[in-house]
Amino acid sequence: MFNKKVLKHNLAEMNPKELIKFIKHEFPINGQDYHTHARKVQIIKSLSPSELSSAIARMEGIKSQYDPSKTWGIGSLILGTSFIGFQVLFGVNISKITEGNRLNALIYVLITIIICLWTLRNIIKDKENATTADYLKELLIQIKSEKN
C-alpha cells in the first residue's frame, strides 16, 4: 500500500536494500498505469520541504553507495591479485601449459570465468540500484522545485 505514512516511514527507516526494492515495486522500470503513477506522485507532493530534502539526501547517499564506479578500481585490483594467487595455488603458468598442468590450468580458467561473471552480475545489479535511487532523487528534486 502506497500512502504518505508508509512513504515517510520507508524513506526514513528502511535499509538501503529494502528501500531500493520498495522503489522498484512502486515505480517499476517498465512503467505503470498513468492514474496509479499520478496518485503516487501526488502523495510525494504532499511531503513537506524538509521531508523532501531529507529524502533527496538519503537517495544521493544510496546512489553513491551502489555506484560501481566508486568501487571498481579497488575491485579490479583485488580481482587481479586473486587471479595471480590462483595461478600460484594451482601451479599454473598460462603462457606455459604442459601435459602435467593442463587440468590445473582448466580449473584455474573455469574459476576465473566464474568469478568474472559473478563480479559482472554484481556490477550490473549495483548499477541498476544506483539508477533506481537516482530516479527517485530526481523526482523528489523536481517536486521540491515545483513547491518553491
Swiss-Prot record:
Its annotated compartments are: Cell membrane
- The transmembrane segments are 72-92, 104-124
Q: Has keyword RNA-binding?
A: no
Signal peptide span per the entry? Answer: none
Q: Which domain of life is it from?
A: Bacteria
Q: Give me the Gene Ontology terms describing cellular component.
A: plasma membrane
Record bears the keyword Cell membrane:
yes
Membrane topology per the record? Multi-pass membrane protein
Q: Which UniProt keywords apply?
A: Cell membrane, Membrane, Transmembrane, Transmembrane helix
Question: What is the protein's given name?
Answer: SPbeta prophage-derived uncharacterized protein YomK
The organism is Bacillus subtilis (strain 168)
